[in-house]
């Protein structure tokens, strides 16, 4: 019985700490060495085609970084790239990476917008569908936490009011 109660407390604790969603949020991470390599590769690129490939690799690495500043750099690069793209396949890839960047930076609304645009381009993309589910799960989780905080605040205020009225 104690073990069951312990599991319940652990799962509630994991839910509110974010650990419960870790499996849904497992996207590859990129370290600074890979980012540095991509930056070097871009600096050494001679022709435009090669530069575009290097920019895509660098933006991929940046949005997969552990560092929030890198993620923001990746988002900025991708936002600039999405505007000029006419190829559906490349647009899908850029929108996916942009959605992932927003997701990893905590901007779930923008992330959802980008992933929906991505799915308009390629509705059958399993990668995009998985990210959309992770986004929706996170939005629901944040909503539940927000409601929990609001209910707790109301309870505290009601408790204080009741204590004041009794005295």
Curated annotation (Swiss-Prot):
Coiled coil: none annotated. PROSITE patterns: TPR, TPR_REGION. One of its GO terms (cellular component) is peroxisomal membrane. InterPro entries: Fis1, Fis1_cytosol, Fis1_TPR_C, Fis1_TPR_N, TPR-like_helical_dom_sf, TPR_rpt. It is a single-pass membrane protein. CDD domains: Fis1. GO terms for biological process: mitochondrial fission; peroxisome fission. The chain crosses the membrane at residues 144-164. SUPFAM superfamilies: TPR-like (SSF48452). The keyword Nucleotidyltransferase does not apply. Keywords: Membrane, Mitochondrion, Mitochondrion outer membrane, Peroxisome, Peroxisome biogenesis, TPR repeat, Transmembrane, Transmembrane helix. It is found in: Mitochondrion outer membrane; Peroxisome membrane. The keyword Magnesium does not apply. The C-terminus is necessary for mitochondrial or peroxisomal targeting, while the N-terminus is necessary for mitochondrial or peroxisomal fission. Belongs to the FIS1 family. Interacts with PEX11A, PEX11B, PEX11C, PEX11D and PEX11E. Plants silencing FIS1B show reduced growth, increase in the size of mitochondria and decrease in the number of mitochondria per cell. Overexpression of FIS1B increases the fission of peroxisomes and mitochondria. PANTHER family: MITOCHONDRIAL FISSION 1 PROTEIN B, TETRATRICOPEPTIDE REPEAT PROTEIN 11 TPR REPEAT PROTEIN 11. This is Mitochondrial fission 1 protein B. It comes from Arabidopsis thaliana. The lineage of its organism: Eukaryota, Viridiplantae, Streptophyta, Embryophyta, Tracheophyta.
